[in-house]
Amino acid sequence: MVVHILGKGFKGKEVIKIALASKFYGIGKTTAEKICSKLGFYPWMRMHQLSEPQIMSIASELSTMTIEGDARAIVKDNIALKRKIGSYSGMRHTLHLPVRGQHTRNNAKTARKLNKIDRRGIHTFSQAKVQHNPSLWSCIFGK
């Protein structure tokens, strides 16, 4: 039996709190446990044990939270703000290097690869076009 909540399919044997934490971006184990305790589900209740009103209560609870695309947009905006204000972590994002203090002498290849790729709409690299300005060259070289 498959249970559908907000367009996501859950197997019937899955534990509710683990299933919510694994399927929805922005919900971890702690948040999933809080949702279950708020709605009155016991800790290891499985998806196939839910009734239709309980499924609807989970859906209504999740619809009030910032999850999926909204949570990703917030992360993207935070990274863009760090770059814009010129913070150290923003600079590390721009240079495609590890942000959280990891060593880079040997093992930074993964961060370099992942920070260059457009991951779920978070693109970190842009190239500016350099244009020739004759008046600038005349000021520099005095011709």
Swiss-Prot record:
Among its keywords, does the record have Ribonucleoprotein? yes
SUPFAM superfamilies in the record, alphabetically? S13-like H2TH domain
The protein's matches in Pfam families, at most eight in alphabetical order, are given as: Ribosomal_S13
Report the subcellular localization.
Answer: Mitochondrion
Q: Which GO terms describe its molecular function?
A: RNA binding; structural constituent of ribosome
Q: Which GO terms describe its biological process?
A: mitochondrial translation
Give the superkingdom in one word: Eukaryota
Q: Where does the secretion signal sit in this chain?
A: none
Question: Which keywords label this protein?
Answer: Mitochondrion, Ribonucleoprotein, Ribosomal protein
**Which Gene Ontology terms of cellular component type are present?**
mitochondrial inner membrane; mitochondrial small ribosomal subunit; mitochondrion; peroxisome; small ribosomal subunit
Known role: Component of the mitochondrial ribosome (mitoribosome), a dedicated translation machinery responsible for the synthesis of mitochondrial genome-encoded proteins, including at least some of the essential transmembrane subunits of the mitochondrial respiratory chain. The mitoribosomes are attached to the mitochondrial inner membrane and translation products are cotranslationally integrated into the membrane.
Misc. comment: Present with 259 molecules/cell in log phase SD medium.
Q: Which family does it belong to?
A: Belongs to the universal ribosomal protein uS13 family.
Q: How does it assemble?
A: Component of the mitochondrial small ribosomal subunit (mt-SSU). Mature yeast 74S mitochondrial ribosomes consist of a small (37S) and a large (54S) subunit. The 37S small subunit contains a 15S ribosomal RNA (15S mt-rRNA) and 34 different proteins. The 54S large subunit contains a 21S rRNA (21S mt-rRNA) and 46 different proteins.
**UniProt-recorded name of the protein:** Small ribosomal subunit protein uS13m
Lineage of origin:
Eukaryota, Fungi, Dikarya, Ascomycota, Saccharomycotina
